[in-house]
Amino acid sequence: MDEYKNIEEKMKKTVSVLKDELNTVRAGRANAAILDRITVDYYGVPTPINQLGTISVPEPRVIVIQPWDAQILKEIEKEIQKSDIGINPNNDGKVIRLVFPPLTEERRKELTKLAKKYGEDAKVAIRSIRRDGIEKKKAMKKNGEITEDDLKSAEKDIQNLTDKYIAEIDKLIEIKEKEILEV
């Protein structure tokens, strides 16, 4: 039974990673999570932007980054420009403003494709976890540790777990698509 918990834990982790990835996909509204992957070289240490200052969303399409150390403003601005978020930062010497323009139809479709790709990657990971779990059970059967019936039962249980998490992934992707396509 311990293997099931292990398999389920891995599947939960995969879904959790997918949620984090989907948070970084911009969907018309400003979301501070899109900055999570951007790091700034702060005294020789790559540091996430959210650890360098206050990030706020004062308006639906604006993110304001107010660093605690004003000297790092230029570095933050440079890293945001180098990133793939597609927003040009406005630096006024005290804060950096990221103004999100309304998404074009073309950009919405690109973001939808990206969300679907993340979903497919997660499904592949789930299926890989399923395959590994079933292979372990088959090896146990081969070694005489479990019976044929136990193997069939285990395969069914693992498949049910897989179906559950694949459905959860589909639901997450569907929600994200609606969010992206919402005008």
Curated annotation (Swiss-Prot):
User: By its UniProt entry, which InterPro entries does this protein fall under?
Assistant: Ribosome_recyc_fac, Ribosome_recyc_fac_dom, RRF_sf
Specify the signal sequence span. Answer: none
Give any GO molecular function from the UniProt entry.
Answer: ribosomal large subunit binding
- List the GO cellular component terms: cytoplasm
Q: Keywords in UniProt for this one?
A: Cytoplasm, Protein biosynthesis
Q: SUPFAM superfamilies, from UniProt?
A: Ribosome recycling factor, RRF (SSF55194)
Can you say where in the cell this protein is located? Answer: Cytoplasm
A GO BP entry is:
translational termination
Primary role: Responsible for the release of ribosomes from messenger RNA at the termination of protein biosynthesis. May increase the efficiency of translation by recycling ribosomes from one round of translation to another.
Hey, which family's this protein in?
A: Belongs to the RRF family.
Name this polypeptide is given = Ribosome-recycling factor
Q: What is the lineage of its organism?
A: Bacteria, Bacillati, Bacillota, Clostridia, Eubacteriales
